[in-house]
C-alpha cells in the first residue's frame, strides 16, 4: 500500500497551521524523515508526502504575523483577515513548494502530493469565494488556477519526470458560490498534464461537515467526485470519505469510480 504523510509545511512560520505539524522548509528535517521512510519501506509500503501552505488558515497568534492569502477573505467565518500576496511573493512561495518536494525525494518519499483543497492557500486561489483578484491570478478559471500551475511546475522541476505527483483538491466545495464538480473539471484542464494521481476530497472550512466527514454521511459518498475526474482525464484517482465498510471500498473499485481507496481512520 501507499502511506501518505499529510499536511507538511513548506514555509515556516507563515504557512504553518498546527503546533505539531511536520516541516520541510529546511534540510535539517530530512534525516528523521528518511528514518521514517526506510522503516516503512522495509515493511513493503510505498511512502507519499503531502506538502502544504496554510495561507489564511494560519493564526497570527502562532505565526507572529498577519496570515496571507489570495485576497482579504478569512478562511472561515470569524477568522482573521489575511493580506493579499504580491506577485513576487506568489512566485517565491511556489518555489518553496519545489524546494520542499526536492527535500521529500531526498528523504526517500516515493510520491509527492500537493494539497490544493480544504481552504488552504492553493484552495484560496482556486475558489471564487476567497479570490477576488483582478490581476492574472484572479477572475477566470485559468487565472485562479495559475498559482497552482506554478506550484506544480516547480515541484515537477524539483523531483524530475519519474516521481509521481498527486494533487489533493476539493472537487466539490459544497458552498454557495464555490466551485462545483464542473468548475473543478474546468480548472483542472490547466493543471492536468503534470499530474499523475488525483486525491479527490471535498468541502471548504465553510462546509466542514463535508471536509471532515460527518458520521451520518453514507460510506463512500464522495466517490462520484473521483469518478468525474477519472472519466474526464483518465488518470488514477483516490476515493476517500467515510469508507468504513470494506464492501463499499470493493464496490467503488469494482464499478470504476476510483483506482485507489484512501482511509484515514482504520
Where in this protein do the model-derived segments appear?
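Flavin-dependent oxidoreductase catalytic cores
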Residues: 1-266
Amino acid at each position: 500500500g501507499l502511506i501518505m504523510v499529510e499536511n507538511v509545511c513548506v514555509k515556516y512560520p507563515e504557512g504553518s497551521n498546527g503546533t505539531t505539524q511536520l516541516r520541510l522548509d529546511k534540510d535539517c528535517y530530512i534525516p528523521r524523515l528518511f528514518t521514517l521512510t526506510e522503516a516503512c519501506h522495509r515493511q513493503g509500503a510505498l511512502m507519499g508526502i503531502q506538502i502544504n501552505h496554510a495561507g489564511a488558515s494560519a493564526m497570527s497568534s502562532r505565526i507572529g504575523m498577519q496570515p496571507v492569502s489570495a485576497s482579504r477573505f478569512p478562511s472561515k467565518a470569524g477568522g482573521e483577515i489575511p493580506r493579499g500576496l504580491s506577485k513576487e511573493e506568489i512566485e517565491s512561495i511556489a518555489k518553496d513548494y519545489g524546494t520542499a518536494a526536492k527535500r521529500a525525494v531526498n528523504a526517500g518519499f516515493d510520491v509527492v502530493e500537493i494539497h490544493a483543497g480544504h481552504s488552504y492557500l492553493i484552495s484560496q486561489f482556486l475558489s471564487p469565494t476567497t479570490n477576488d483578484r483582478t490581476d492574472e491570478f484572479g477572475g477566470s478559471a485559468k487565472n485562479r488556477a495559475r498559482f497552482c500551475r506554478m506550484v506544480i511546475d516547480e515541484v515537477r522541476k524539483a523531483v524530475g519526470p519519474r516521481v509521481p505527483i498527486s494533487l489533493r483538491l476539493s472537487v466539490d466545495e459544497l458552498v454557495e458560490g464555490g466551485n462545483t464538480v464542473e468548475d473543478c473539471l474546468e480548472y483542472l484542464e490547466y493543471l492536468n498534464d503534470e499530474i499523475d494521481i488525483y486525491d479527490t476530497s471535498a468541502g471548504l472550512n465553510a462546509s466542514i461537515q463535508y471536509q471532515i466527514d460527518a458520521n451520518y454521511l453514507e460510506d463512500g459518498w464522495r466517490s462520484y467526485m473521483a469518478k468525474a475526474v477519472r472519466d474526464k482525464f483518465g488518470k488514477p484517482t483516490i476515493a476517500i470519505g467515510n469508507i468504513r465498510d470494506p464492501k463499499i471500498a470493493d464496490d467503488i473499485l469494482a464499478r470504476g469510480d476510483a483506482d485507489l481507496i484512501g482511509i484515514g481512520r482504520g
